[in-house]
Amino acid sequence: MRINRTIFFILITFSILVGLQAIAAESHTINAEARRFVADIVHIQVGDSVAWINMTSHNTVSIDGMIPEGAEPWRSDMGENYQLTLNVEGVYAYVCEPHLGFGMVGLIVVGEPTNLEKVREVASKLVGPYRRIIGKLKKVSAPK
């Protein structure tokens, strides 16, 4: 009987902790304006969500080599609002493909920017309007 109580207590404790983590997760909004994302740099915690809204003539696409190792790349449908939960710590760079030439790029920093140097290295080799991401990377501090 004592074993059943112990197992029950462990299960209840685990359920509460999982529930608290879900409650603590936040949703952050990125607004797609005519030719820019507002906010263009977002700092969030692991497990938080990002929602892109007002995507009438926009999409959001992660940039190859500029997301953390083990993270899933994404490509939203054109004209559709999009939501993504990020569970891997690091820097994520993304663009709006139709408006890339206008500098419509953004960064999401999840927890500590553990892959910042790798992302900066990839950014240094970008050409054309993709290079606009470099200015945004200068605003991100290296992990402590």
Language model: regions and residue ranges:
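Extracytoplasmic copper-binding redox domains, predominantly the cupredoxin/blue-copper superfamily
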Residues: 19-144
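Bacterial N-terminal signal peptides
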Residues: 9-18
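Bacterial N-terminal signal peptides that target proteins for export
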Residues: 1-9
